[in-house]
Amino acid sequence: MSLLAQLDQKIAANGGLIVSCQPVPDSPLDKPEIVAAMALAAEQAGAVAIRIEGVANLQATRAVVSVPIIGIVKRDLEDSPVRITAYIEDVDALAQAGADIIAIDGTDRPRPVPVETLLARIHHHGLLAMTDCSTPEDGLACQKLGAEIIGTTLSGYTTPETPEEPDLALVKTLSDAGCRVIAEGRYNSPAQAADAMRHGAWAVTVGSAITRLEHICQWYNTAMKKAVL
């Protein structure tokens, strides 16, 4: 049975939650062994897949979880706004570390390596390709190039202002066009994740609301301070 077929079964049984275990950089939680522990806890709680950034984190996580891992490498480039898995070497390193799915930036922005080249390299390793997109045009272009999974990950992050709510309209548009959509980006409550599924998402990735303790504390602190002002 193919990995996609296995995921279809798991999503039908468990609801389609993917947990992104990416601690705040330099946080006390930003250690491979802690990332792996969070991933294992998420798997035991019913997550159908895990999203991991960085080769060391992926290696540590691969050793303890059996669910599929979506691997990425983030870089801050001087000559490109693209941050997610920008190089062939990143794809190779993630494949070697045990990723099942490799996600790349799928936006139409200047980049060191074309999207189609990165997709071909992912498929060379026999892995599934996911593209993190920001618009319907991005997603449909990546689907035509052969990406098996389209993420709404970058919606709201390629524009001057980032909205507070997730982009459900993008989920629906891509789903209606026949894409296998992972809704991602600002899904900070179970209700929002459920809305994404109702709008046609194949699965939903949740990160900050589950694995970024600093963000969660900030949300509570902000709300509570407002209540007493």
From Swiss-Prot:
Any single biological process term in GO: N-acetylneuraminate catabolic process
Catalytic activity: an N-acyl-D-glucosamine 6-phosphate = an N-acyl-D-mannosamine 6-phosphate
Involved pathway(s): Amino-sugar metabolism; N-acetylneuraminate degradation; D-fructose 6-phosphate from N-acetylneuraminate: step 3/5
Molecular functions per Gene Ontology: N-acylglucosamine-6-phosphate 2-epimerase activity
Tagged with keyword Isomerase: yes
Pfam family, one: NanE
The organism's place on the tree of life at top rank: Bacteria
Any GO CC annotation of this UniProt entry: cytosol
Record-listed E.C. numbers: 5.1.3.9
Keywords tagged on the record: Carbohydrate metabolism, Isomerase
Record-linked InterPro entries: Aldolase_TIM, NanE, RibuloseP-bd_barrel
SUPFAM superfamilies cross-referenced by the UniProt entry: Ribulose-phoshate binding barrel (SSF51366)
Record-linked NCBIfam families: PRK01130.1
Function per UniProt: Converts N-acetylmannosamine-6-phosphate (ManNAc-6-P) to N-acetylglucosamine-6-phosphate (GlcNAc-6-P).
Protein family per UniProt: Belongs to the NanE family.
HAMAP family the UniProt entry points to: ManNAc6P_epimer
Name of the protein: Putative N-acetylmannosamine-6-phosphate 2-epimerase
Organism: Escherichia fergusonii (strain ATCC 35469 / DSM 13698 / CCUG 18766 / IAM 14443 / JCM 21226 / LMG 7866 / NBRC 102419 / NCTC 12128 / CDC 0568-73)
Originating gene: nanE
